Design a protein with these regions (language model features):
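Lipid deacylating catalytic domains
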Residues: 1-237
């Protein structure tokens, strides 16, 4: 577990979204954080084609190169000299690799020298079945690998029989949970099981009635009604 570090909640934030989700889905989150007093908040622009390319290492590198450029831009104007990272779904797993200085994909990013907090939202950290690159991250950089970084893992619990759940999540959630964690009966956000999203050693929050994304339910991690809850948890450390 990394040493606890004091993080300024107002320092700039960079958001990396989830697989096949484009930046506009996170624009309300960035705007809300700025209204709350965060110095600046940006979303990493990634097209759907670029997400499809993350099946391969060069696709990860392309996205993380963009993360690195934006982090350095935000760092230059940060009152603390540091940046907070938010990763949704697969983005949260990718950012764990970004924090490391090990040249796994032919380049070490040294992200932990610039970023002292990583918040993950419904990220499939621990899985019995995952893509090779996600497995590599959890094998090479298990848990809270970088000392001095405050890792916070947010999981959602979605009642599949409740009003929030979409018909899609009702049909597919149990199959997703079985695929990721080996058990169709687990609780989760409609895609990622709670036990997979709670990164080992991180600060944990299980958020009720929260879907993985807009496709899975009306209220998800990026909905303003949910944002305030997990952001309050993160910053009241």
């Amino acid at each position: 577990i990394g040493e606890m570090t004091t993080v300024d909640p107002r320092q700039p934030v960079l958001i990396l979204g989830g697989f096949l989700i484009t930046a506009e889905a996170y624009a309300p989150m960035a705007a809300w954080l700025k209204q709350l007093g965060v110095f600046d908040a940006h979303v990493v622009p990634v097209t759907r084609l670029e997400w499809l390319l993350t099946t391969w290492g060069f696709g990860w590198r392309r996205v993380l190169d963009r993360v690195d450029a934006l982090v350095q831009q935000l760092q230059a104007s940060s009152p603390t000299g540091r940046v907070t990272l938010i990763g949704h779904s697969s983005g949260g797993v990718m950012l764990r690799l970004y924090l490391s200085d090990e040249p796994v994909l032919g380049r070490g990013y040294h992200g932990a020298t610039r970023c002292d907090r990583l918040i993950t939202l419904g990220s499939p950290h621990q899985a019995v079945r995952a893509t090779p690159l996600r497995l590599l991250v959890d094998r090479r950089f298990p848990g809270c690998y970088e000392p001095g970084v405050d890792y916070v893992a947010i999981a959602g619990e979605l009642d599949l029989n409740g009003d929030n759940a979409s018909s899609f999540s009702r049909r597919t959630a149990s199959g997703s949970y079985k695929s990721i964690a080996g058990d169709a009966e687990l609780s989760g956000d409609g895609l990622v099981p709670v036990e997979s999203a709670l990164l080992k050693g991180a600060r944990h929050l299980v958020q009720p009635d929260t879907a993985h994304g807009g496709f899975f339910g009306k209220l998800w991690y990026g909905s303003l009604q949910r944002l305030e809850s997990w952001w309050t948890f993160v910053t009241n450390d």
